[in-house]
Amino acid sequence: MKTILAVIFFGILAFAFADYPSIENCTHPPAMANFNQKKFLEGKWYVTKAKHGSNSTVCREYRAKTKGNDQILVGDGYYSFNGGTFYFTVRCKRLPNKEVQKPLQFTCTQKSTDDPSKMFKFQLEVTILDTDYANYAVMYRCVQFPEQLGSHFEDNTLLLHRNPDQLVDENQVERKLNLSFDSFRSREDVVDGCPKLPSKKKNKAS
C-alpha cells in the first residue's frame, strides 16, 4: 500500500493521503469490440461508482471537447489537498492512436486556481470495457506518476453515466462483463450529495 501526496484526475486519488493497491504496471482488461472513440469522447460523463477512492472520486464529472486538432478531456473539480478541499482545473490532451483495441492515451496537467505551485503532470491510459455511448460506460483507467512522485502506477475501474440521475440496470452490465459493483463506492452514498462546481464565469476553462 502506498501513501501519495497528490491529487489526480478520474478518481486516481481523490484526497491527499490515499491507499491504493500496489501495482507494477497498467493491466488493461480487453476493450469492447468495435469501440467508437469519437462517440465516447464527446459530451459529459459522470462517475457514479468507483472500485477505489473516496466521495470525491464518485462525484467527479468530466467533459470532452475539441480544440483545433486536439481532443481534450476536462476534469475540473474539488480535490482534497493537505487537509483541505480545493478547486483544481484538469486538462488531458489525447495522444494520437487510431487502433481501437489499444488504450486511449492522454498527457494531463492538474493545477490549483488559487496556488500555482500546486501543479501536477501525469500520463493517463483509458480502456472502455463497455458502453452504449448515450447512457453509460464502464472504464478502466491507469495513471503513471511522474518521477518526482515516485514513477509508480495507480488504477481504478469506474462506472460512468451521461446523466447521474438516470441510471441503467447495473445487473445487466454486471452479467455482461462478469463483474460485480457490490464493493464499489457509490455516488448515491455521498451524504448531502456532491458539491456544485463554481460558475464557468468565475473559473473559465482555458
Swiss-Prot record:
Subcellular localization: Secreted
Glycosylation (residues): N25, N55, N178
GO function term, MF aspect, one: toxin activity
GO biological process per UniProt: suppression of blood coagulation in another organism; symbiont-mediated perturbation of host defenses
GO annotations of cellular component type: extracellular region
Keywords recorded for this protein, A-Z: Blood coagulation cascade inhibiting toxin, Glycoprotein, Hemostasis impairing toxin, Secreted, Signal, Toxin
The keyword Signal appears for this protein: yes
Keyword Signal: yes
Tissue: Salivary gland (at protein level).
InterPro entries linked: Calycin, Triabi/Procalin
Notes on how activity is controlled: Zn(2+) modulates binding to host coagulation factor XII (F12) and high molecular weight kininogen (KNG1).
Signal peptide: 1-18
The family this protein is said to belong to: Belongs to the calycin superfamily. Triabin family.
Quaternary structure, from the entry: Interacts with host coagulation factor XII (F12) (inactive and activated) (via amino acids 1-77). Interacts with host high molecular weight kininogen (KNG1) (via amino acids 402-532).
Biological role: Suppresses activation of the host plasma kallikrein-kinin system, leading to inhibition of the intrinsic coagulation pathway. Blocks host coagulation factor XII (F12) and prekallikrein (KLKB1) reciprocal activation without affecting their amidolytic activities. Blocks binding of host F12 and high molecular weight kininogen (KNG1) to negatively charged surfaces. Attenuates generation of bradykinin by interfering with activation of host kallikrein-kinin system.
Protein name per Swiss-Prot or TrEMBL: Triafestin-2
